[in-house]
């Protein structure tokens, strides 16, 4: 990671933490010390950018770094998720080479990392046909289906269902791919229309209510 981007990420994390602490103080106690240790290069990066693309790449590097602890990875994930709420940023995931490292995090040993990865995928593909197609291009749906039916962490399963829900609605290719990878018993083999919200809701409710025995 570029040193200035690394320092900027640390600054962002520190100030995110300070903001949370200040919000939790209810106006009592001393305010957190301000952090003004930004060097000129960092200030230039901050006020001349960095671009959203730079921030997205820095967050992903932090998420894959062994030197960043879980708490700060959660902050990086939260920042990343907020960035890709923008359709333009979500569509920039592929040019930036970020889809593959994001999908890899669905198989992370930490349940919170899997949960956040699924959450980010769900955010990226929601009402975004171009991003929905990436679920097929990067073979994401089999992993999301496996998570939704067998992940030992209920919160991770829930976010996997959310990602599936966002990915298949009104996009038939993803809907067909999703159904193809479902375990037996979830459908009767009939084709489900990606525009049929009631049918999709009923199928997703089955996923929520009946995780496989592996997750029991």
Swiss-Prot record:
Keywords: Cytoplasm, Repeat, Translation regulation. Belongs to the FES1 family. This is Hsp70 nucleotide exchange factor fes1. It holds the Pfam family HEAT_EZ. One of its GO terms (molecular function) is adenyl-nucleotide exchange factor activity. InterPro entries: ARM-like, ARM-type_fold, Hsp70_NEF-Inhibitors, Nucleotide_exch_fac_Fes1. Its main location: cytoplasm. GO terms for biological process: cytoplasm protein quality control by the ubiquitin-proteasome system; regulation of translation. The keyword Cytoplasm applies. It is found in: Cytoplasm. Gene3D superfamilies: Leucine-rich Repeat Variant (1.25.10.10). Functions as a nucleotide exchange factor (NEF) for Hsp70 chaperones which accelerates the release of ADP. Required for fully efficient Hsp70-mediated folding of proteins. One of its GO terms (cellular component) is endoplasmic reticulum. ARM repeats lie at residues 27-68, 87-126, 129-169, 185-216. The keyword Repeat applies. Residues 19-38 are annotated as: Disordered.
């Amino acid at each position: 990671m570029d040193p200035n981007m690394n320092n900027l990420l640390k600054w962002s994390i520190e100030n995110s933490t300070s903001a949370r602490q200040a919000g939790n103080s209810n106006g009592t106690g001393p305010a957190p010390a301000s952090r003004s240790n930004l060097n000129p290069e960092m200030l230039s990066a901050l006020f001349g950018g960095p671009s959203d693309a730079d921030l997205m790449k820095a967050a992903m590097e932090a998420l894959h770094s062994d030197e960043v602890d879980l708490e700060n990875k959660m902050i990086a994930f939260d920042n990343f998720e907020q960035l890709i709420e923008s359709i333009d940023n979500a569509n920039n995931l592929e040019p930036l080479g970020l889809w593959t490292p994001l999908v890899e995090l669905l198989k992370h040993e930490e349940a919170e990392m899997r949960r956040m990865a699924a959450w980010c995928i769900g955010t990226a593909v929601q009402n975004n046909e171009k991003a929905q197609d990436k679920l097929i291009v990067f073979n994401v749906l089999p992993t999301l289906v496996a998570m939704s039916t067998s992940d030992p962490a209920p919160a991770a399963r829930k976010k996997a269902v959310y990602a599936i829900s966002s990915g298949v609605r009104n996009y038939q290719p993803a809907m067909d791919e999703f159904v193809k990878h479902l375990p037996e018993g979830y459908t009767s083999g009939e084709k489900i229309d990606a525009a049929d919200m009631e049918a999709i809701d009923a199928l997703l409710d089955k996923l929520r209510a009946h995780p496989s025995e592996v997750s029991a």
